[in-house]
């Protein structure tokens, strides 16, 4: 039975699932999309990355996929057996996916120089026939999404101040433990935060890289998780 992950690791949600598969040592193949139509073909439910073929099912949404992986291969678990800690892990994962993610999106798509770099990065592995469509459609579409979400309406200095506060809060939550909530084993929360920090810490978003580099604790956290899932 082939397990196939559909998506590009430039997406923090694909990276989250990729690291989960590696953590559980589940062999898999990765198929990258060759254009926007592949997204709908690979994931007809939502048309987004990632999707996963697992045990004869086509799964979607990174949270739902990792939940299914925990059932497919329970060890190592992605949630603590302690219900209060597991609840905190689920909440942090959801916050990383639904809130922290948008800081990276604004930095990529609402700053012209970063948008140019982002499009170049996205297009380099796409067929030449698709690139003009991406260059034309993506900036306008994604920037409108960030404004509708709210963060895209903030002045850049305010956005970066808020991002800094969130990163400082993550350091407090991490504490002295190797992973969040003083656990020795990465959880679904760690995978989600790792994916979003990597999304911020990118050559296309120097502002995000500078923000993360202020916190050595977060860089060391990423190094630990990377070593366990490389």
Model features per residue range: what roles?
Residues 1-132:
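GST-like domain detector, emphasizing the conserved glutathione-binding G-site
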Residues 71, 95, 197, 224-227:
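Residues within well-ordered alpha-helical secondary structure of globular protein domains
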Residues 102-213, 217:
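GST-like fold's C-terminal all-alpha helical module
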Residues 218-224:
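Intrinsically disordered, low-complexity polar regions and short flexible loop motifs
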Residues 97, 167-171, 226:
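Structural signal for well-ordered, non-membrane alpha-helices
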